[in-house]
Curated annotation (Swiss-Prot):
Entry's Gene Ontology BP terms: mRNA processing
Annotated region (Disordered), positions in chain: 1-178, 278-307, 360-423
Superkingdom assignment: Eukaryota
Protein name, UniProt field: Pre-mRNA polyadenylation factor fip-1
Keywords tagged on the record: mRNA processing, Nucleus
Keyword Nucleus recorded: yes
Species whose genome carries this gene: Neurospora crassa (strain ATCC 24698 / 74-OR23-1A / CBS 708.71 / DSM 1257 / FGSC 987)
Stretches with biased composition (Acidic residues): 1-11, 65-90
Gene: fip-1
Length: 423
């Protein structure tokens, strides 16, 4: 660029001129713009000739000359760049054949220096990675031999063998360490010899052992999870009650006790004689329409208590019977009328609660309503259901359409042939 400007500046002093170039520039500006500009540039740089005097050129050609000069500058710079590139020599091999020095390893390996996996060639054969530790191994071997140590290769092989054996058998690995703290255990307060949940602060601890009561102390140094002296006492009491209630041994003991009570109740019920019940009260239910056939014989007495009450029964039996009566009352039934429910089928109506529990039947019943014949004899309570409570045998056939109501084994009194439903 500097050379071209100097040539333009000193152009009038040189004797040589280029009339063809001037004529071409003056006569054909379009041609100069398209095709003649490179030719003019080449001529100017190679022959170092100057253009014509400024008087011969017209004003219309000045912008074109300026463009040509700019083009000359660009092309000249490109030529210089090409010359600079041609001077660079790339040497890929060492002339002396010496090994390269060992690479300097930094403290932290960079990502780009991490060795990649060997890529497969076009033939499908994998190339083995090149080892860079030839010089370092030789230096380490010589230094170790110099100081009387074993060879580096031998030590490396031994370490590899030892690591393989340890990884295979696991005998040389360090033992697995586990915590020895029992998480679910309750620590024992040694001065008192009680578990920490059973220590009573006011009784087991003297005044000197209550530093949290001193002014300015932090309770979190002595109580965790936001407890204080009083909430801790409530928590310990609750924990003790829960452990006593839901302990496996306590539950097993309660179950065993309940089984023994049930067994005693069953044995007492089986040992009672059949005629233990007292006489029942008089029948109070009206006679229903008679069923077919005459009344059957009276059934055997049940195991019920005395007629009219539960005085001779064990407490457990009385409690269960009270539960049964409560359940009947909950269903809308009147417990006082249970002796009349469905048992007034014939004249031999079972009276009172004594008939329910196997006592003998009540007094003679009245004639059947609309019956064609006399009523049968008074029926006694049959063999009782559920804890010996007999409700009479087949006595519900006469009462209000003849539904069989809780019949036992004994035959109750049946009315005469009446207008009831035939069964």
């Amino acid at each position: 660029m500097d050379i071209d400007e100097d040539e333009d500046f000193y152009a009038p002093d040189e004797p040589q001129a280029a009339p063809p170039t001037t004529a071409a520039t003056t006569t054909t500006p379009a041609t100069t713009t398209t095709t003649a500009a490179p030719t003019t540039t080449t001529t100017t740089t190679s022959t170092t000739t100057a253009s014509a005097p400024p008087t011969t050129t017209s004003s219309s050609t000045k912008p074109e000359d300026e463009l040509e000069e700019g083009e000359e500058e660009d092309e000249g710079g490109g030529a210089m760049d090409e010359d600079d590139d041609s001077d660079i020599d790339i040497i890929t091999e060492r002339k002396d054949g010496s090994a390269p020095p060992p690479p300097v390893q930094s403290r932290y390996s960079e990502i780009r220096n991490i060795p990649q996996r060997a890529a497969a060639n076009d033939n499908g054969v994998k190339t083995a990675p090149v080892k860079k530790s030839d010089g370092t191994n030789s230096n380490s071997n010589s230094s170790s031999n110099k100081f009387g140590g074993g060879g580096g290769i031998g030590n490396e092989q031994k370490t590899r063998q030892g690591s393989g054996a340890a990884g295979g058998s696991g005998a040389e690995l360090p033992p697995v360490r586990t915590s020895k703290i029992e998480v679910d255990g309750i620590p024992v307060y040694k001065p008192v010899g009680k578990p920490i949940t059973g220590v009573v602060i006011d009784e087991d601890l003297p005044e000197n052992d209550k530093p949290w009561r001193k002014p300015g102390t932090d309770l979190s140094d002595y109580f965790n999870y936001g407890f204080d002296e009083f909430t801790w006492a409530l928590y310990a009491q609750k924990q003790e009650a829960l452990r006593g209630e839901y302990n496996a041994e306590a539950i097993a003991a309660n179950n065993k006790k309940m089984m023994e009570e049930m067994t005693n109740m069953m044995m007492m019920g089986g040992m009672m004689p059949p005629g233990m019940g007292g006489p029942g009260g008089p029948g109070v239910g009206p006679a229903g329409p008679g069923a077919m056939g005459p009344g059957g014989p009276a059934g055997a007495g049940g195991m019920g208590g005395p007629g009219g009450g539960l005085d001779g029964m064990p407490p457990e039996m009385q409690a269960m019977m009270q539960q049964m009566m409560g359940a009947a009352a909950a269903q809308g039934m009147d417990p006082s009328q249970m002796g009349q429910m469905g048992m007034a089928g014939g004249p031999g109506d079972m009276g009172g609660m004594g008939g329910m529990f196997g006592g003998p039947g009540g007094g003679p019943g009245g004639p059947g309503t609309g019956g064609m014949g006399p009523g049968g004899p008074g029926g006694q309570g049959g063999q009782g259901q559920q804890f010996g409570g007999g409700f009479g045998g087949n006595q519900g056939q006469g009462g209000y359409g003849g539904y069989d109501q809780m019949g036992g084994a004994g035959g109750g009194g049946r009315g005469g042939r009446g207008r009831g439903r035939r069964w």
